Amino acid sequence: MSEAGGAGPGGCGAGAGAGAGPGALPPQPAALPPAPPQGSPCAAAAGGSGACGPATAVAAAGTAEGPGGGGSARIAVKKAQLRSAPRAKKLEKLGVYSACKAEESCKCNGWKNPNPSPTPPRADLQQIIVSLTESCRSCSHALAAHVSHLENVSEEEMNRLLGIVLDVEYLFTCVHKEEDADTKQVYFYLFKLLRKSILQRGKPVVEGSLEKKPPFEKPSIEQGVNNFVQYKFSHLPAKERQTIVELAKMFLNRINYWHLEAPSQRRLRSPNDDISGYKENYTRWLCYCNVPQFCDSLPRYETTQVFGRTLLRSVFTVMRRQLLEQARQEKDKLPLEKRTLILTHFPKFLSMLEEEVYSQNSPIWDQDFLSASSRTSQLGIQTVINPPPVAGTISYNSTSSSLEQPNAGSSSPACKASSGLEANPGEKRKMTDSHVLEEAKKPRVMGDIPMELINEVMSTITDPAAMLGPETNFLSAHSARDEAARLEERRGVIEFHVVGNSLNQKPNKKILMWLVGLQNVFSHQLPRMPKEYITRLVFDPKHKTLALIKDGRVIGGICFRMFPSQGFTEIVFCAVTSNEQVKGYGTHLMNHLKEYHIKHDILNFLTYADEYAIGYFKKQGFSKEIKIPKTKYVGYIKDYEGATLMGCELNPRIPYTEFSVIIKKQKEIIKKLIERKQAQIRKVYPGLSCFKDGVRQIPIESIPGIRETGWKPSGKEKSKEPRDPDQLYSTLKSILQQVKSHQSAWPFMEPVKRTEAPGYYEVIRFPMDLKTMSERLKNRYYVSKKLFMADLQRVFTNCKEYNPPESEYYKCANILEKFFFSKIKEAGLIDK
């Protein structure tokens, strides 16, 4: 090794580019630092031929195995050994990375042992402690001159620096062994960053032109998957829902230990993809998620908590294919209960999730999904994943299947400090036991139903043993039209497939048989339609048909043509064979078609219905009032003489195939809540007799006992709600701006951070803050003053519910609340 500064980890200059971030990585050097000489600590750190960098610890990019599990274990052992060494040995180690301070003119930036150890190093020689008077082979000054700044450093700080030293040496090996240019460049940047932090005795912070800090996208992958479970499976019974939650945990766990392929490999596989965007995420992933698994002196983040939809889209297809292939290969190694979960349920789960990942209008990626579905999420849907400490080491059991969930290991002291899980004594927001005891005394927002009551009602209506009354083995007389069909689909009696003819590839025999079956069903059920016309459209490549299959044969279908550029789909034929009608198949068929179109971002149906079909289409939400402009569809759809044009607008937030189940459950909840309220009000009033005397209507407040139920009349406001939306918007904007500018508004400007307020989101079920209100106002969410006032009132109520009355936050809430009410009175929104 050259003895000039900048040759190796002991003498590599850390000044140039050390402060640059991963987005502005220093150019890859023409000649990387050469291999360390005999006796250099790098040789010992490499640990023989088994050492490798995080990205090179796997054979192929994209594997699901956590890279370098053995490497991280070796590093942990070496750190433990070094931290238990005598102080003199520690000083020798740190001296290698410390600039000489004997003279200002001395440029030596790392002490070099004049008597290097042999290669490979012998165990008996490793324990020899060098004297502080030993001269440096490079500058001839004593070791003490290199470590004079460490004389009064505590053992804890010295151990921290030694941990960084071993991480530097590990990254030095990575730089030399890595073949991919992009990955090598990131390793080199991190190597210099850690090297600089040793020289300056600071904490390494990744920074630079990638100004964005974690999280890089909201909502995160973890939140998106959690939203997906709530969106698609909240209606399921608790046992089935728990299965979905387990699948979600498994999926998130695999992403956290998934190894991303290098940008160069991705460029070869997908030349048309956005490589620059992927490279940016890959760099962030290396710096914040991958390398910190092994170099714990760097702050570590979970991939699923700091990345969002963009990264998930870039890896999902490959990841899904490899996970399922891996599951098939290792099915014999899996326990029986895991085998069913992974081989049967996991593929379906991934398919449904894939549709939401790539859909443009999927609600699971909306920022306000949680606030919009907060009540649904509380009905038994638990958080999909309980986040482990942000920094931690993961151990894999080599004897178990690689699809088993890894166990979270222990965090190092440095990691615990950065994880934010331990409350500091000086934290302002502190939850005390006395506060919990006083919870019942706190005011609550009007209309909120206690979660204990909701959970109790849910446990009653979902537990057959808790429901009173006779057992029934058949569908209720009031069950939804599609309930029988939905149950048959779950049992596998019926199936739904979108099929169509193709000019590009030869359809398989099964699809051709189904197309012929569809032609026959439409011909029999639509006798006034020419058979040749039906055949032409069914086999037209521009048309598709949602086929209903039972016992392997077609019993119904909906033929349609999509016009993506116009934003609508034309329904051409819709029929179910006569002997299979009145079973709910028609409704369930249409609901599947609606969900199919939501996934393809087409939210309008148009159809010409004859006199016999109008009733059916009305039941499916169609109307004679067409919502889309006439210019969009004139000249595109087929006009039928004597038929009525009908349209249907789809709501992308509604899971149509499960909609009736959700409505039914909501009705059951309301019914049970009413029954409980009735049980609390013991007084029975006689019925109203006024209607017998010809009275057509009476004021609600005149009904005997109505006030005892908790009903309150709405006060007659002198100044009515502004009818003009723009006028209301301007008024609310002015009020909100004045509230935000108030000197007591500072605690409420941003959403409460979990690290600042432990347990806040377990106490406060419906959080609100001024930033969220500003975004809602900007998006025209507040269509009435009541919505606006309810949100701002919730800000104050939440604060008072969480914080004790003597706290500064509580006092700020009282002051700001009075100010707010004075402003809405001035604006004439309430009576003065």
From Swiss-Prot:
Query: TM spans, by residue?
Result: none
Ranges of Gly residues composition bias in the record: 1-22
Cross-referenced Gene3D superfamilies: 3.40.630.30, Bromodomain-like
**In its keyword annotation, does this UniProt entry include Cell cycle?**
yes
Q: Name one GO molecular function term.
A: enzyme activator activity
Q: Where would you find this protein in the cell?
A: Nucleus; Cytoplasm, Cytoskeleton, Microtubule organizing center, Centrosome; Cytoplasm
User: What is its EC class?
Assistant: transferase
* Pro residues bias: start-end ranges: 24-39
* Residues covered by the N-acetyltransferase domain: 503-651
Tissues of expression: Ubiquitously expressed but most abundant in heart and skeletal muscle. Also expressed in the skin, in keratinocytes (at protein level).
The Bromo domain, residue ranges: 723-827
EC no. given is: 2.3.1.48, 2.3.1.57
**For acetyl-CoA, which residues are the binding ones?**
C574, A575, V576, Q581, V582, K583, G584, Y585, G586, T587, Y612, A613, I614, G615
List all Polar residues biased stretches: 395-413
Q: Where is the composition biased (Basic and acidic residues)?
A: 425-436, 714-725
Principal location listed in the UniProt entry: nucleus
GO BP = cellular response to insulin stimulus; cellular response to oxidative stress; cellular response to parathyroid hormone stimulus; chromatin remodeling; gluconeogenesis; heart development; internal peptidyl-lysine acetylation; limb development
Q: What does the UniProt entry list as the effect of changing Y760A?
A: Reduced acetyl-lysine binding
Domain note: (Microbial infection) The bromodomain mediates binding to HIV-1 Tat.
| Annotated disease | Defects in KAT2B has been found in a patient with isolated coloboma, a defect of the eye characterized by the absence of ocular structures due to abnormal morphogenesis of the optic cup and stalk, and the fusion of the fetal fissure (optic fissure). Isolated colobomas may be associated with an abnormally small eye (microphthalmia) or small cornea.
Assembly behavior: Interacts with SIRT1. Interacts (unsumoylated form) with NR2C1; the interaction promotes transactivation activity. Interacts with EP300, CREBBP and DDX17. Interacts with NCOA1 and NCOA3. Component of a large chromatin remodeling complex, at least composed of MYSM1, KAT2B/PCAF, RBM10 and KIF11/TRIP5. Interacts with NR2C2 (hypophosphorylated and unsumoylated form); the interaction promotes the transactivation activity of NR2C2. Interacts with KLF1; the interaction does not acetylate KLF1 and there is no enhancement of its transactivational activity. Interacts with NFE4. Interacts with MECOM.
**Could you tell me what this protein does?**
Functions as a histone acetyltransferase (HAT) to promote transcriptional activation. Has significant histone acetyltransferase activity with core histones (H3 and H4), and also with nucleosome core particles. Has a a strong preference for acetylation of H3 at 'Lys-9' (H3K9ac). Also acetylates non-histone proteins, such as ACLY, MAPRE1/EB1, PLK4, RRP9/U3-55K and TBX5. Inhibits cell-cycle progression and counteracts the mitogenic activity of the adenoviral oncoprotein E1A. (Microbial infection) In case of HIV-1 infection, it is recruited by the viral protein Tat. Regulates Tat's transactivating activity and may help inducing chromatin remodeling of proviral genes.
Family indicated by similarity = Belongs to the acetyltransferase family. GCN5 subfamily.
What is the protein's name according to its record?
Answer: Histone acetyltransferase KAT2B
What is the scientific name of the source organism?
Answer: Homo sapiens
Give the gene that encodes this protein: KAT2B
